[in-house]
Regions:
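Active-site anion-handling motifs in enzyme catalytic cores
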Residues: 1-372
Length: 372
């Protein structure tokens, strides 16, 4: 049995994942857990969730939308099966807190025991959910933000009003985007930009060497989020491209795309199967931060489609990760063809150097603030 140097409690997106099949959200916690384990740090994921009724809100919304956008019982059933697979992954692969909490008051009354408390990563600071700012942590215990994301370039005055004092109470703050550093500075808080946890571990830490591929034929894989406008996907172009490549098209979509994508292309996977499809895809199309991250992890050729309309604020995360790895030319716009982007080689040696440099910054951060 391992002897751990430190006990860390992490609050992240547990409540969100209970209602949404979001691959990036679940893997960012898993990756941070695996990373900390390498330093003999025992971590637990605080099971903080909203009241029970809200757990079913997403399913109700999907059911109503399915009726509005076309009768899609198959899609609803697939969502339920995938949600079951997500929960199995959480219970089998993630260290969870012994207790569940459904209010900040209960967290304050009886928080999980730990030497250090961490919030992050993902968009834990996209709003002012009090628990994500670690206000429940007992006096004298260290509070750290790791790669926390605001999910936007600037905050409203209302947002600042709610969170400024909470952020100022942290012992150490790191954020995921450079815009987050500026936001923290505007609150009088010193912050540094660090890697998303998913980039702290390697491909082999997600999938064992030699794992058998699930799809035997050639396929193009897409991961989309937040869009409900068919035209924003350039889906006809992607379909045509996959046909030219003699590859089938597989699309995973959440938060909207699953309601408009033709069912013959739409798939929902367990977390493990989703990774497998990333690993063996011919190429990737995505409009998400973690869609880009896993293209990098599995060294896949990829195209990025920017989000539009209300969801366009999410592009801040996309610009940030592409700039970090010098991959801004992967954005598919009206002036570029899919073939031109996919044919353009990616310098994976340079990607590896950038990743290693930024991993050292994370190592230094935790060595300083976890004393490991």
């Amino acid at each position: 049995m391992a002897i751990y140097k430190k006990k860390v409690a992490i609050i992240s997106s547990y409540a969100y994942i209970r209602g949404h099949n979001n691959y990036g959200s679940i893997f960012q916690y898993y990756a941070l857990q695996q990373y900390l384990k390498k330093f003999d740090v025992d971590s637990c994921w605080i099971r903080y969730m909203f009241p029970v009724w809200s757990m079913y809100k997403d399913l109700i919304k999907k059911t109503v939308n399915s009726l509005l956008y076309g009768f899609r019982l198959k899609n609803i059933w697939n969502h339920i099966k995938t949600q079951i697979a997500f929960r199995k992954f959480m219970y089998d692969k993630c260290n969870l807190s012994e207790r569940k909490y459904d209010s900040i008051d209960k967290l304050k009354q009886n928080p999980p025991e730990a030497d250090v408390y961490i919030t992050g990563s993902d968009q834990v600071w996209g709003g002012w959910l009090e628990a994500n700012y670690l206000t429940f942590v007992p006096n004298g215990k260290k509070k750290i933000a790791y790669a926390a994301s605001f999910g936007k370039r600037q905050l409203t005055e209302e947002h600042l009003f709610h969170v400024q004092a909470w952020v100022q109470g942290f012992d150490a703050v790191s954020v995921r985007e450079m815009s987050g550093v500026d936001i923290c500075h505007s609150m009088g808080v010193k912050a540094q930009c660090l890697l998303d946890p998913t980039l702290l571990i390697d491909e082999v830490d997600y999938l064992p060497v030699g794992v058998e591929r699930l799809e035997k034929g050639r396929y193009v894989f897409c991961y989309f989020i937040n869009e409900r406008n068919f035209d924003n996907f350039r889906l006809e172009d992607i379909i045509a491209y996959s046909k030219r490549q003699n590859a089938i098209l597989k699309i995973t979509g959440i938060e909207g795309p699953e309601m408009i994508i033709p069912l013959r292309y739409l798939y929902q996977y367990s977390p493990e199967a989703w990774l497998n499809h990333y690993k063996y895809a011919e190429c990737i199309f995505t409009n998400t931060f973690h869609g880009i991250v896993f293209s990098i992890i599995f060294q896949k050729q990829f195209c990025v489609l920017l989000q539009k309309g209300v969801a366009a604020k999410q592009n801040e995360r996309i610009y940030s990760i592409l700039k970090l790895f010098e991959l801004e030319d992967r954005i598919l716009d009206s002036n570029k063809s899919i073939e031109n982007i996919i044919a353009k080689p990616i310098n994976w040696d340079n990607i590896k150097k950038i990743k290693e440099k930024w991993r050292l910054k994370t190592d230094a951060f935790f060595h300083e603030y976890l004393n490991i």
